[in-house]
């Protein structure tokens, strides 16, 4: 990534946005993966 001039130099990577994205994305992918798997595991 190019250096962002608008943001301070010591901009942390692990921010609330990072926690929100991963905190929601990981369970969502697991949930969608479970639903997708159930579509193929029919009796």
From Swiss-Prot:
An annotated Gene Ontology molecular function: electron transfer activity
Keywords (A to Z) from UniProt: Chloroplast, Electron transport, Heme, Iron, Membrane, Metal-binding, Photosynthesis, Photosystem II, Plastid, Thylakoid, Transmembrane, Transmembrane helix, Transport
Residues given in the record as heme binding sites: 22
Entry GO CC: chloroplast thylakoid membrane; photosystem II reaction center
Cofactor binding annotation: With its partner (PsbE) binds heme. PSII binds additional chlorophylls, carotenoids and specific lipids.
Keyword Iron (UniProt): yes
Cell wall biogenesis/degradation in keyword set: no
Functional description taken from the UniProt entry: This b-type cytochrome is tightly associated with the reaction center of photosystem II (PSII). PSII is a light-driven water:plastoquinone oxidoreductase that uses light energy to abstract electrons from H(2)O, generating O(2) and a proton gradient subsequently used for ATP formation. It consists of a core antenna complex that captures photons, and an electron transfer chain that converts photonic excitation into a charge separation.
Subunit structure: Heterodimer of an alpha subunit and a beta subunit. PSII is composed of 1 copy each of membrane proteins PsbA, PsbB, PsbC, PsbD, PsbE, PsbF, PsbH, PsbI, PsbJ, PsbK, PsbL, PsbM, PsbT, PsbX, PsbY, PsbZ, Psb30/Ycf12, at least 3 peripheral proteins of the oxygen-evolving complex and a large number of cofactors. It forms dimeric complexes.
Protein name as annotated: Cytochrome b559 subunit beta
Organism in which the protein naturally occurs: Phaeodactylum tricornutum (strain CCAP 1055/1)
Highest classification ranks of the organism: Eukaryota, Sar, Stramenopiles, Ochrophyta, Bacillariophyta
Gene: psbF
